[in-house]
Regions:
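Conserved beta-strand-loop-alpha-helix hinge in the C-terminal portion
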Residues: 238-260
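Pre-NBD coupling/linker segments of ABC/ABC-like ATPases
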Residues: 1-14
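ABC family nucleotide-binding domain
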Residues: 19-20, 26-234
Length: 260
């Protein structure tokens, strides 16, 4: 399987060191007269090169945490540090640039452009993200490498409608890898898949940590959450449990490096 070599991101890039630190995070919506607390004083850290799960039932606040980790939403109080850099202090433009350079997002419902092939969907991500510091003439090779990592290279020229749900999610993973971000964030990546396909997609994501990626995923599935190397359990906007340093259950695969 091919590998995209992740660039260094300060001292926190060393495996096991905190890459992301969430401190006393709260999110409150509504007016002064009628407030709704979505998150209340949430604190946790995400180790570099970990497979990190945010687990909880519907309404627990896990999607809100995800949106704040990607910079889509701002916290009411508290802060998020990425390799020591505080996201809340960034302007909207700076935050958008940061997100484009550092985060690849995998959506629950794939969000592939239906009129573009799998390869073209990945190439579009390169176009929108600036090409991951590659020359344009190298984009196609990078896109094919990403599809190979996600194990759908043989589906490169098919439209999403001709792919199974699991294959579409793998293309979405390839797209998230296109600009070689150090962080992959996935929103219920196995939620719409049958159990066998879900575990196959999970193993693909877990394998990315061996290539230097930090993979963060939201799930309501306790079995999927338990397979992570670290996780938090949310309930009603609070962290009710934290689990660190579990073993990731995934079969080892040979890696062939591709340097940009």
């Amino acid at each position: 399987m091919r590998s995209l070599v992740t660039e260094e991101v300060g001292d926190a890039k060393v495996a096991g060191n905190p890459l992301i630190e969430v401190e006393h995070l709260s999110r409150v919506i509504g007016s002064r007269l009628q407030k709704t607390v979505i998150l209340d004083d949430v604190t946790f850290s995400i180790p570099a090169q970990s497979l990190f799960a945010i687990n909880g039932p519907s309404g627990s606040g896990k999607s809100t945490v995800l949106n704040m980790l990607t910079g889509i939403d701002r916290p009411s109080s508290g802060r998020i540090l990425f390799a020591g850099q505080e996201l809340r202090r960034m302007s909207e433009n700076a935050l958008a640039r940061w997100r484009g350079q550092h985060v690849g997002i995998v959506f629950q419902f794939f969000q592939l452009v239906p009129t573009l092939t799998a390869l073209e969907n990945v190439l579009l991500a390169l176009e929108l993200g600036g090409g991951g510091k590659l020359r344009r003439r190298d984009w196609r090779e990078r896109a094919m490498d990403c599809l190979e990592i996600a194990m759908v290279k043989d589906r490169a020229h098919r439209l999403p409608g001709a792919l199974s749900g699991g294959e579409q999610q793998r293309v979405a993973i390839a797209r998230a890898l296109a600009n070689n971000p150090p962080i992959i964030i996935a929103d219920e990546p196995t939620g719409n898949l049958d159990s066998r396909t879900a575990y196959q997609v999970f193993d693909t994501m877990a394998g990315l940590t061996r290539q230097g990626k930090t993979v963060i995923y939201v799930t309501h599935d306790k079995d999927m959450a338990a397979r992570a190397s670290a996780r938090i359990d949310l309930l009603d906007g609070h962290v009710v449990d934290q689990h660190m340093a579990n073993a990731i259950v995934v079969e080892p695969q040979p890696v062939m490096e591709v340097h940009s």
